[in-house]
């Protein structure tokens, strides 16, 4: 049961991109023991679809993509400059997309 939990957590965090996932099913609810280099069945919902912005074989952006993830990335393109990506909290201002990156600017801490 612990092995199933670990494999399920791993698959939920790291999308299935190729044949490197290691799992073989016996007959117990499609979960079973981990065996090297063979995939026969996976729990429903354990595999996330691959990111269309990334080429899994090269680990690079697909042609025409500007970004693959981030609060300022939408459908593989940078979000326009000025869009709020993180609301103000306390004394910190709203953080806005720059239009040059898929990442929301980092929080600034003042002494």
Curated annotation (Swiss-Prot):
<dbReference type="GO" id="GO:0090729">
    <property type="term" value="F:toxin activity"/>
</dbReference>
<dbReference type="GO" id="GO:0005576">
    <property type="term" value="C:extracellular region"/>
</dbReference>
<dbReference type="InterPro" id="IPR001762">
    <property type="entry name" value="Disintegrin_dom"/>
</dbReference>
<feature type="short sequence motif" description="Cell attachment site">
    <location>
        <begin position="89"/>
        <end position="91"/>
    </location>
</feature>
<feature type="signal peptide">
    <location>
        <begin position="1"/>
        <end position="20"/>
    </location>
</feature>
<feature type="domain" description="Disintegrin">
    <location>
        <begin position="47"/>
        <end position="111"/>
    </location>
</feature>
<comment type="subunit">
    <text>Heterodimer with subunit beta; disulfide-linked.</text>
</comment>
<dbReference type="GO" id="GO:0005886">
    <property type="term" value="C:plasma membrane"/>
</dbReference>
<dbReference type="InterPro" id="IPR018358">
    <property type="entry name" value="Disintegrin_CS"/>
</dbReference>
<dbReference type="InterPro" id="IPR036436">
    <property type="entry name" value="Disintegrin_dom_sf"/>
</dbReference>
<feature type="disulfide bond">
    <location>
        <begin position="85"/>
        <end position="104"/>
    </location>
</feature>
<keyword id="KW-1217">Cell adhesion impairing toxin</keyword>
<keyword id="KW-0873">Pyrrolidone carboxylic acid</keyword>
<keyword id="KW-0964">Secreted</keyword>
<feature type="disulfide bond">
    <location>
        <begin position="72"/>
        <end position="97"/>
    </location>
</feature>
<dbReference type="GO" id="GO:0007155">
    <property type="term" value="P:cell adhesion"/>
</dbReference>
<feature type="disulfide bond">
    <location>
        <begin position="53"/>
        <end position="76"/>
    </location>
</feature>
<feature type="propeptide">
    <location>
        <begin position="110"/>
        <end position="111"/>
    </location>
</feature>
<keyword id="KW-0732">Signal</keyword>
<keyword id="KW-1201">Platelet aggregation inhibiting toxin</keyword>
<keyword id="KW-1199">Hemostasis impairing toxin</keyword>
<keyword id="KW-0800">Toxin</keyword>
<keyword id="KW-1015">Disulfide bond</keyword>
<feature type="modified residue" description="Pyrrolidone carboxylic acid; in Disintegrin acostatin-alpha, processed form">
    <location>
        <position position="48"/>
    </location>
</feature>
<feature type="disulfide bond">
    <location>
        <begin position="67"/>
        <end position="73"/>
    </location>
</feature>
<dbReference type="Pfam" id="PF00200">
    <property type="entry name" value="Disintegrin"/>
</dbReference>
<comment type="function">
    <text>Inhibits fibrinogen interaction with platelets. Acts by binding to alpha-IIb/beta-3 (ITGA2B/ITGB3) on the platelet surface and inhibits ADP-induced platelet aggregation in human platelet-rich plasma.</text>
</comment>
<dbReference type="GO" id="GO:0030195">
    <property type="term" value="P:negative regulation of blood coagulation"/>
</dbReference>
<feature type="propeptide">
    <location>
        <begin position="21"/>
        <end position="46"/>
    </location>
</feature>
<comment type="similarity">
    <text>Belongs to the disintegrin family. Dimeric disintegrin subfamily.</text>
</comment>
<protein>
    <recommendedName>
        <fullName>Disintegrin acostatin-alpha</fullName>
    </recommendedName>
</protein>
């Amino acid at each position: 049961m612990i092995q199933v939990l670990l494999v399920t957590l791993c698959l939920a965090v790291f999308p299935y991109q190729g044949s490197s996932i290691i799992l073989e099913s016996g007959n117990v609810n499609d979960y079973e023991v981990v065996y090297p280099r063979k995939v026969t069945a996976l729990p429903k919902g354990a595999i996330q679809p691959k990111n269309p912005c990334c080429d899994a074989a090269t680990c690079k952006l697909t042609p025409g993509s500007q970004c693959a993830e981030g609060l300022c990335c939408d459908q593989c393109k940078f979000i326009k400059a000025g869009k709020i990506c993180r609301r103000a909290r306390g004394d910190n201002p709203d953080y806005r997309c720059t239009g040059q990156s898929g990442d929301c600017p980092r929080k600034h801490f003042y002494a």
